[in-house]
């Protein structure tokens, strides 16, 4: 539920994990608002209500070692929970993080492992499995545009500074989601503790728009 997330908005700093343990419940509300913006009514916390996997924090931090975090979960046990959901809803497509969890967050890596194992354990045959990623060419253009306006993209001087950037040759599929950009951006803004409105995400959106957020 994001209990260890970094709070980027000063006005909400009282929710930080270093304060009272209340960020998780606040982020549940953020998620509910994001799902409403996207028109999604069926979303779930893995294992809820009987099992709760806590946010593991960034790689190499102390929360990684807590026994109740997702990073420490038994992969087969967690995968069996997800496999039952797959058997229930019978999806055509499964989408998950890539093998490095996007930017290396332990919970994202674990989500990849659990999703892939669940696809093996479920009785339902999923037609396609996609790993979400960002091609280098798109990110390189984004960095160039940010430099033009005197800003930066998370401090990256070049695309090689971004560990989640994938060589274009490995990107097999591009889905045109241009019609959903407004809903997508509204959903992003719903995560108010995590994204600053004057930060690189929205600066990039203002300068590249559909070019970077319209495609999946």
How should each PLM-predicted stretch be described?
Residues 1-90, 117-121:
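Active-site rim/loop-helix segments in enzyme catalytic domains that contact anionic ligands
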């Amino acid at each position: 539920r994001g209990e260890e997330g970094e709070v980027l908005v000063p006005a909400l700093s009282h929710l930080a994990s270093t304060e009272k343990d209340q960020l998780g419940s606040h982020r549940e509300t953020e998620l509910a608002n994001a799902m409403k913006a996207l028109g999604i009514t069926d979303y779930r916390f893995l294992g809820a209500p009987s099992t709760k996997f806590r946010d593991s924090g960034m790689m190499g931090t102390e929360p990684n070692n807590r026994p109740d975090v997702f990073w420490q979960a038994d992969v087969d046990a967690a995968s069996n929970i997800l496999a039952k959901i797959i058997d229930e809803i019978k999806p055509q497509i499964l989408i998950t993080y890539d093998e490095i969890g996007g930017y290396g967050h332990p919970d994202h890596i674990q989500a990849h492992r659990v999703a892939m194992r669940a696809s093996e354990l479920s009785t339902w045959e999923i037609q396609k499995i996609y790993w979400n990623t960002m091609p280098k060419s798109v990110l390189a253009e984004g960095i160039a545009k940010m430099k033009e306006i005197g800003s930066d993209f998370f401090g990256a001087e070049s695309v090689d500074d971004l560990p989640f950037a994938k060589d274009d040759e490995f990107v097999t599929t591009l889905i045109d989601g241009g019609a959903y950009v407004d809903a997508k951006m509204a959903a992003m803004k719903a995560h108010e503790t995590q994204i600053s409105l004057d930060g690189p995400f929205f600066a990039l959106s203002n300068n590249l728009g559909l070019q970077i957020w319209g495609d999946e």
